[in-house]
């Protein structure tokens, strides 16, 4: 009798082990798939998020105090193979725009203040050669635009 109870107990334990193994495997696949889906969904959203209009970039600067992720500096672009005279930014850095470099304000057309620095970013760039639209933002978050390549400036924030 004890021998039969031992065999029955072994069968139950084996069955429970198999059920646990199946359950753990299913849970692992479920969480793995969910994580991959969330990661790829976030990646696609981030890659698709190109902000390059005057209002879009100005709003982003005011909110986050940095340029959107689709901006790279001239040196970062050059490291990827960008040559300004070739107009090849879209080829070497798809979806990216030039921005974040220092603007010297040599002519003094933008408001000056001790310790204030200005940076610039391309606006409305899609491909080919860069256009004349730029946004200028200061270290104390003044924001100006130019549509005539630094000839005139308009405060937008």
From Swiss-Prot:
Xref: CDD domains: barnase (cd00933)
Signal peptide residue numbers: 1-34
Residues making up the propeptide: 35-47
Any one GO molecular function term: RNA binding
InterPro entries tied to this protein: Barnase, N1-like, Ribonuclease/ribotoxin, RNase_N1/T1-like_sf
Biotechnology: Introduced by genetic manipulation and expressed in male sterile maize and rape by Plant Genetic Systems and in radicchio rosso by Bejo Zaden. Barnase expressed in transgenic plants will specifically destroy the tissue(s) where it is expressed. After cell transformation, protein expression and plant regeneration, the active nuclease destroys the pollen producing organs thus rendering the plant sterile.
Catalytic residues (UniProt): 120, 149
Enzyme class at the top of the EC tree: hydrolase
Enzyme Commission number(s) from the entry: 3.1.27.-
SS bonds (residue pairs): none
Cellular compartment(s): Secreted
A cellular component annotation (GO) from this entry: extracellular region
Transmembrane segments: none
Domain of life, source organism: Bacteria
Entry keyword set: Endonuclease, Genetically modified food, Hydrolase, Nuclease, Secreted, Signal
Functional note: Hydrolyzes phosphodiester bonds in RNA, poly- and oligoribonucleotides resulting in 3'-nucleoside monophosphates via 2',3'-cyclophosphate intermediates.
Family, similarity comment: Belongs to the ribonuclease N1/T1 family.
Name this protein carries in UniProt: Ribonuclease
Organism: Bacillus amyloliquefaciens (Bacillus velezensis)
């Amino acid at each position: 009798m004890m021998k039969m109870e031992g065999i029955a107990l072994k069968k139950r334990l084996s069955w429970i082990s198999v059920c646990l193994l199946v359950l753990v495997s299913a849970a692992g696949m479920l969480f793995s798939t969910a994580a991959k889906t969330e990661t790829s969904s976030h990646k696609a959203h981030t890659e698709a998020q190109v902000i390059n209009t005057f209002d879009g970039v100005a709003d982003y600067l005011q909110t986050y105090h940095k340029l959107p992720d689709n901006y790279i500096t001239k040196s970062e672009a050059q490291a990827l193979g960008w040559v300004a005279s070739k107009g090849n930014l879209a080829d070497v850095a798809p979806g990216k725009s030039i921005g974040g470099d220092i603007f010297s304000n040599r002519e003094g057309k933008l408001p000056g203040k001790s310790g204030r620095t200005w940076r610039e970013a391309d606006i409305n760039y899609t491909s080919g050669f860069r256009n004349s639209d730029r946004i200028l933002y200061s270290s104390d978050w003044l924001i100006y635009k130019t549509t005539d390549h630094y000839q005139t400036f308009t405060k937008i924030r």
